[in-house]
Each structure stands twice: as C-alpha cells, then as structure tokens.
C-alpha cells in the first residue's frame, strides 16, 4: 500500500508541475529503422553540420563518430572518424562546433573535444569546483546524458540525467562553470539529451515522452511538446518490455525535430510492428514537426 501511495503521489506531483503549460502533441513526419548493422547499436546522440548528420552509440566498442545515411525506407551508419579517449567510454551525447565535436562520457563524467577530420581527442580542463554536488557523490549511471552548444556565445550546456537532475552552463573560452540549475514545471524528472536551436534549449524528458523548450536566460519552460501519441499505444512503447523511456538522441534541423531511440537491444513491440512495420532489435529515428512558437 505504501508503494502504491508513493507511485500515485509521484504521478500527481508530475501532473501538478505542468499545470498552466499547454502541451503540444507533435505531428509525425517520418519514422525509419536502422538496417545493415551487425550486432547491437545503442544510439545515444545525433547532430549535424551542413547536410551531414552524425550519430554516436554508447557501448565501449563504439569509439567512432558515425555518419548517418538517410535513405528512402531506412537508415545506415558508416564510421566518419575514430577516437581514443584513453579511458573507458560510455558516450551519451554529441554536439558540433565548427570542425570539433564535443562528446560527453558518462563513464567518468568528463567532456572531450574530438577533431572531425582526424579524430584527435582531448579532455576539456573544466574546473568542477563550483558544483553544488561534487561528481564523486553522483549516483552511478545518473551522470551526463545530454550536451548542446550555443555557438554564438560559445556556451556549452551539459545535462545531468537524474537523482538529481540539473543543467550546467560552461564557458568554452575559459572552461569554467557559468551557472548550474534545474528547470521547474517539467513533465518528468529526467533529461536524456539537449539541443540548442534558435536561442532556446530543448530537453528530452524521455520517461514522459515529452520535450521541454527552455529559455536559458530565465531557466523557465516556455513550451512543452509531447510525442506520446506517435510513440506509444495504451502505455505500450516502441520497444517492450522496458522500464524506462528510451528516446536518448535529440536534434532540430530546419524546423524538424529528430528523436533517436536507444533500445538497449530490446525488440520492437507489437504496437511498433503493427503501426510502423518495424522489426528486430535495431533503433529507430523519428522525425516530428516543430510547431511555431507561441
């Protein structure tokens, strides 16, 4: 009974936290599944430069930045560049700044810069001394999960996933923390990825199948978007059985939201097979229309 009360309290708190925020249901433009890959590919990040789209995966063998080949009926990947960080890797996010990729490694919760041309890699020497919660006290598997960049201001945004969740702003010129904060009135208590687009920060709240549009100057949510109708059916997700939501990669390009799924090797659900003709255990990418700002 106590457990039931706690669950009900959580959902009530989540609902109350979003009161006053209109949630826009996103329109599906396309959905495609990865093909021609031997083994497991746990998609964890997506970004682009010009017409080229790049993705990453979070297993120890995925020491590559991959080029995504978007095709009529599916998508494939091919290694663009390989890197050696000199440590164990669990790459959970990517963002681009000119010819440099910034990667977050949840294995040690550090940020790395990788040259897209030759794979030369270096760790950013960020002073973490200002953190309210020292990294050594972070829960395992609850560290950096999202990264985004404001190229004009040269500000890097890092998302700590959960327990507790917060965003860290980094001045890339000085490699120091500008500020650290959480965002109120969100759909859930996690961030799975970030993307900076036209002055706003977008964050995936994967356990609520929701995206928050955040004003980085006020730290407030200005719009909520939901992909629940296109990514679930009566509680059944694209991949089952799973405990958590699995959307872990976020990109916005030319007014289109790209969401990638890290399915952890889980097979697609009956819902995904029937509605989208998906199959097997490889990840999908979903394209959704970004509504006009209100």
Predicted segments with their positions:
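Sequence/structural signature of beta-propeller domains
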Residues: 21-294
């Amino acid at each position: 009974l106590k457990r039931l009360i706690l669950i009900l309290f959580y959902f009530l708190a989540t609902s109350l936290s979003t009161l006053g925020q209109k949630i826009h249901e996103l329109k599906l433009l396309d959905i495609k599944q990865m093909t021609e890959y031997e083994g497991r590919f746990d998609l964890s990040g997506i970004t682009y430069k010009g017409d080229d789209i790049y993705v990453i995966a979070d297993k120890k063998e995925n020491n590559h930045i991959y080029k995504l080949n978007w095709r009529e009926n599916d998508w494939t990947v091919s290694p663009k560049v390989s890197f050696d960080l000199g440590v164990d890797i669990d790459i959970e996010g990517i963002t681009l700044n000119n010819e440099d990729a910034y990667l977050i490694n949840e294995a040690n919760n550090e940020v790395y810069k990788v040259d897209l041309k030759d794979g030369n890699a270096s760790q950013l020497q960020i002073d973490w001394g200002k953190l309210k919660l020292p990294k050594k006290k972070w829960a395992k598997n609850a560290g950096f999960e999202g990264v985004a960049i404001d190229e004009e201001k040269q500000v890097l945004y890092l998302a700590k996933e959960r327990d507790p969740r917060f965003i860290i702003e980094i001045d890339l010129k000085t490699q120091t923390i500008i500020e650290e904060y959480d965002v109120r009135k969100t759909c859930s208590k996690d961030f799975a990825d970030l993307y900076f687009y036209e002055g706003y920060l977008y964050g995936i709240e994967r356990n609520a199948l929701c995206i928050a549009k955040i004003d980085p100057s006020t730290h407030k949510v200005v719009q909520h978007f939901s992909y629940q109708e296109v990514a679930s059916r009566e509680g059944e997700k694209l991949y089952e059985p799973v405990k958590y939501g699995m959307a872990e990669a976020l990109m916005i390009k030319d007014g289109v939201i790209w969401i990638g799924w890290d399915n952890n090797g889980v097979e697609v659900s009956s819902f995904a097979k029937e509605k989208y003709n998906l199959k097997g255990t490889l990840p999908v990418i979903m394209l959704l229309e970004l509504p006009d700002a209100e």
